[in-house]
Amino acid sequence: ISNNNDSETVKVTPLVDLAITKVVDNANPLFDSIITYTITVVNNGPDASTDVVVKDIWPANGLKFITSTGTYNPATGIWNVGELGSNEIATLTITAKTTAVGKFENKVSVNGTGYDSNLSNNNASVNITVPDCVILNITKVATGGIVSEEPNKEVIAGEKITYTVIVSNYGPSVATNVYLTDLFNDDELLNMEYYSNGNWVKYNNGIALGDIDVNEAVMILFRATVNHSTRGLINNTVRITTDIKDARGNFEANETVKAIDNSTLVINKTSNV
């Protein structure tokens, strides 16, 4: 009779359903702006899952980690969630800065102990698109025809004056269809010209500079004749535009000179006899 009973230990694997989602508060952020990702993990049960781990795979470039909640390690991309009971939810937020333009995908995945009855919801991804951006700068300096620097740059009425304009693009995108406009009083500055392809060309309402590459600087020379009857301050302004919507920086530059009569110049000459 002693051999009429038997026993066997059966290990029952917990049944779980881990699911993950990831969203971003702004899918079209501007360059150098802050965005926040929210990762949500839920265990739909019916049993608890232990050692739940989330892997957050960042793009190789385009985003810089700023801060996060929870036990997220930005160096490894691992978030150790720990145990999730049936119908329990865990949430992680990650704040980042956009550091490039373009489209960037961020992927996440989750796994833990137990038999996961639905693997299709263990992965998620979210995309952001950072539009083109340019940081431009323009300067204008009177560099020719100046006879005195203090207290104002002085030019002689009736003589030529030359201006040097420099347009710089600091990126991160190519500045497309850049257009330059020179604003001046044509009663004060006569016969305004700019230098192009080895020739002086009459200025007429504006100059199409075309595209300016990242870290490229374009120099434009202008020259004009100061009206012989002009006296006092002469202001000259240049402006630039581009068809890049997110354009930043300095789009206008001014230069002021003082027109004087030739007779106001004083020449000191010392001779030894």
Show the residue positions of the predicted features.
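Exported/extracytosolic protein signature
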Residues: 1-273
